[in-house]
């Protein structure tokens, strides 16, 4: 069975990777899809985000990396995917994710959303937090892979 794990991944974190690895044990194919939202300002380009995900998941066989600009439901229909994977860090995530799951179900009744709880050691990590700490020179090595850390340091230092 195929599933999709959509997100902006700006940048990908160990929390994201935890969800990806666990999802690949449940589903035969996991599409990690970088979504583009015109209302969002990104630190990394679409191409950079895709490259980081490819580097971080190269040893996971049943992962497919892709991108999409549009409604998630349209991507699901195009690729015949019926399961959306979402990671939950805390109760506050659940409120938003439940709303999105219900909206997706309304638009496409055969789609189910599977929620995976993030490992507690990653439960406070978000891409926004990682970027903020990096901008102020803090240690982010426990939250992102080395390759991602190097790229983010280059961005924040203007190199």
From Swiss-Prot:
In the record, what lineage is assigned to the organism producing the protein? Bacteria, Thermotogati, Thermotogota, Thermotogae, Thermotogales
Q: In which pathway does it act?
A: Cofactor biosynthesis; coenzyme A biosynthesis; CoA from (R)-pantothenate: step 4/5
Q: Which Pfam families match?
A: CTP_transf_like
Record text on subunit structure and interactions: Homohexamer.
Designated name of the protein = Phosphopantetheine adenylyltransferase
Q: Which gene encodes it?
A: coaD
Q: Which cofactor does it need?
A: Mg(2+)
Name the source's superkingdom.
Bacteria
Which parts of the chain are coiled coil?
none
Site entry (Transition state stabilizer), positions: 16
The entry marks the following residues as binding substrate, namely 8, 40, 72, 86
Q: Which GO terms describe its biological process?
A: coenzyme A biosynthetic process
Q: What's in the GO CC field?
A: cytoplasm
What residue intervals traverse the membrane? none
Which family, according to UniProt? Belongs to the bacterial CoaD family.
Q: What species is this protein from?
A: Thermosipho melanesiensis (strain DSM 12029 / CIP 104789 / BI429)
Residues binding ATP: 8-9, 16, 87-89, 97, 122-128
Q: What is its EC number?
A: 2.7.7.3
Q: Could you give a GO molecular-function term held by this entry? A: ATP binding
Repressor found in the keyword field: no
Q: What function does this protein fulfil?
A: Reversibly transfers an adenylyl group from ATP to 4'-phosphopantetheine, yielding dephospho-CoA (dPCoA) and pyrophosphate.
């Amino acid at each position: 069975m195929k599933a999709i794990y959509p997100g902006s991944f700006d940048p990908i974190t160990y929390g994201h990777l935890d969800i990806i690895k666990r999802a690949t044990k449940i589903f035969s194919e996991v599409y990690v899809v970088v979504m583009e939202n015109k209302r969002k300002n990104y630190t990394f380009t679409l191409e950079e985000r895709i490259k980081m995900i490819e580097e971080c998941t190269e040893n996971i066989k049943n992962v497919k990396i892709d991108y999409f600009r549009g409604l998630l439901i349209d991507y699901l229909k195009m690729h015949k995917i019926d399961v959306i994977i979402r990671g939950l860090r805390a109760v506050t995530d659940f409120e938003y994710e439940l709303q999105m799951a219900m909206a997706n179900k309304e638009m496409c009744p055969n789609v189910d959303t599977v929620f995976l709880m993030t490992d507690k050691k990653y439960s406070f990590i978000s891409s926004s937090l990682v970027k903020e700490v990096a901008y102020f020179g803090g240690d982010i090595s426990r939250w992102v892979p080395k390759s991602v850390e190097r790229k983010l340091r280059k961005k924040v230092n203007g190199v």
